Amino acid sequence: MRITHLAASNWRNFKNVEFDVGERLFIVGPNAAGKSNLLDIFRFLADIAGQGGGLASAVDRRGGLKKVRSLFARTNAKGRLVVDVTLRDGDDSWRYRLSVKGEGKGPNRPVVDEELVVKNGEELLRRPDDRDLMDEVLLTQTHLEQIASNQSFRSIADYFDRVQYFHLVPQIIRDPSRAVVADDDPFGSDFITQMNATAPRTRDAWLGRMQQALRAAVPGFESLT
């Protein structure tokens, strides 16, 4: 399974963004153009679907709905934060759409405004449904994050849960104070640990392929070692 198309509204510094996703995608732009914000859409879906995650947690990690939602939101898409992805899994085509709004009262929690799942043109889920209308607290969670509710589209949840993000920062990799860190730190504090844990034969093969690619792309480059 892989994502083939992405559309989003009111995400970070983007009013609207939409593009196809090939097997390999390069995102190029000047500093502060929003490259990391764009990639964070995929991390956002992973944080919702992942173990111990969920919609509330994914939004809180980013500083709350005010931080995540674009300043354009007041005049765009009714103020909703919208993520709409198309996926391909063999012969099957999937679509997952999530629209989020503020609760509008109390702590203004993020709630589901719309959640849609379509497989091969057949609608598997559309929220809010009758249960949501009877108990609005249910809208504080997506069905994507609930094992009891995502049976018919669990392959999507599992796919999002496997999303990985790496943004290696040399200063963090070399920082001795970060010798003991949580696993899978995206900024590389456990990068050396991961390298050492990789089988030498596998590690050498990977480094060899990287070295060949760098020789072809970087004038004067000779070796990684």
Report each predicted region and the residues it spans:
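N-terminal pre-Walker A segment at the start of P-loop NTPase domains
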Residues: 1-15
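Short, conserved catalytic or interaction motifs in soluble domains
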Residues: 16, 50, 219
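Phosphate-binding P-loop
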Residues: 16-22
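Hydrophobic anchor at the beta1->P-loop junction of P-loop NTPases
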Residues: 27
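The conserved Walker
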Residues: 31
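Conserved lysine of the Walker
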Residues: 35
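Conserved P-loop NTP-binding catalytic core
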Residues: 40-108
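Electropositive, glycine-dotted interaction segments
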Residues: 88-224
